[in-house]
């Protein structure tokens, strides 16, 4: 495969409702799309970096620079045997996994299209449907939170995740468990706590959560190991895991019992598969986290989630949960049973709506 050209586009997509976490509120997503021309095949990837360096040090601006000034010169015109090689070819760039993933995942889309295979099959996926959960941001009232959960359950979602932060943790969990005693419920702290808050987090053991996601520092595997030894509830690591070696360290130190895999955070499909395989060998279940992706990023998540050890419902939701109108056709839909069908068309299995993308584009740069 030879990369002939890439087109970088920044689009703006407005969320149907604001999404609040422990580090801020989003109502508009700045999304960086990569369209790659690989041997004449048009292939797509998405960068999940945000506008601000709060979830990660990466932003839309840093990713644009890395893709334009470093990734493109490294890859252009080079003979590349397989998409799985791109991760290693970009290894001289330290970090910047979200930028790398944007171009790396496009290569996977291209290879799948060239081989006339669904991306899920090229990756080694075994599922024809994936179980879906939903992520609900911090709500201003408990009543509002309960209403959001009722809405998600009515739509068929199999697992409910709520965002928490210091002062908005035990009370909302208690209220939800009282109202919904048997639902699969988890919380996500996005690093809002410190090890000194262990007693507060231990209080959540009483509510039979399936996991507490990333309670402590975004790069602190050691403290998570100390915390996990005090909790009955499994810890799931998110922000701490950037590659297979971070996953290995977390497993060997018993810092978690579950790992969240996000394509952007780990640098693309090849890295995600390595983490998946390591976790599978160590009986650590994984699931796919979400970053408020457009349909292109969501399509890549669906393909990845078809791998065997993605055994817990992920954050891959319907397009209409977040966007009035997505940028792919057909849009992602969730069945009444709370699953998404893995597409069987070649590549990511969804067609980018070029007219819609063009209308949303704020800036564009063609590199050839």
Q: Can you describe what each PLM-predicted range is?
A:
Residues 49, 166, 190-193, 216-217, ...:
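Short, glycine/acidic-enriched loop or turn micro-motifs at the edges of active sites
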């Amino acid at each position: 495969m030879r990369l002939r050209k890439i087109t970088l586009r920044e689009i703006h997509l407005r969320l149907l409702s604001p999404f609040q976490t422990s580090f801020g509120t989003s109502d508009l997503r700045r999304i960086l799309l990569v369209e790659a021309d690989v041997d004449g095949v048009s292939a797509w990837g998405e960068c999940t970096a945000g506008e601000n360096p709060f979830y990660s040090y990466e932003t839309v601006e840093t990713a644009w620079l890395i893709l334009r000034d470093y990734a493109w010169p490294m890859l252009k015109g080079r003979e590349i045997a397989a998409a799985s090689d791109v991760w290693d070819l970009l290894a001289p760039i330290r970090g910047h996994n979200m930028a790398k993933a944007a171009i790396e995942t496009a290569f996977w889309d291209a290879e799948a299209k060239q081989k006339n295979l669904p991306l899920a099959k090229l990756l080694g996926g075994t599922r024809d449907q994936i179980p879906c959960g939903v992520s609900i941001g911090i709500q201003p009232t408990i009543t509002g939170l309960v209403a959001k959960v009722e809405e998600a359950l009515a739509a068929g979602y199999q697992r409910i995740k709520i965002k928490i932060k210091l002062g908005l943790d035990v009370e909302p969990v208690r209220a939800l468990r009282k109202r919904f005693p048997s639902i699969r419920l988890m919380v996500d702290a996005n690093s809002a706590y410190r090890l000194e808050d262990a007693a507060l987090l231990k209080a959540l053991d009483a509510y039979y959560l399936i996991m507490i996601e990333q309670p402590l520092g975004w790069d602190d595997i050691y403290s998570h190991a100390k915390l996990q030894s005090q909790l009955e509830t499994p810890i799931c690591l998110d922000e701490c895991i950037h590659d297979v070696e971070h996953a290995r360290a977390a497993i060997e130190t018993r810092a978690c019992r579950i790992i969240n895999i996000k394509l952007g955070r780990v640098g693309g499909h090849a890295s995600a598969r390595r983490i998946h395989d390591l976790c599978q060998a160590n009986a650590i279940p994984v699931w796919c986290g979400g970053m408020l992706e457009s349909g292109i990023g969501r399509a890549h998540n669906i393909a990845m989630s078809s791998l065997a050890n993605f055994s817990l419902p992920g954050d891959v939701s319907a397009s209409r949960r977040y966007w009035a109108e997505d940028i792919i056709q057909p849009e992602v839909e969730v069945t009444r049973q709370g699953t998404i069908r893995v597409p069987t068309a070649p590549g990511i299995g969804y067609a980018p709506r070029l007219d819609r993308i063009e209308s949303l584009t704020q800036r564009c740069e063609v590199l050839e």
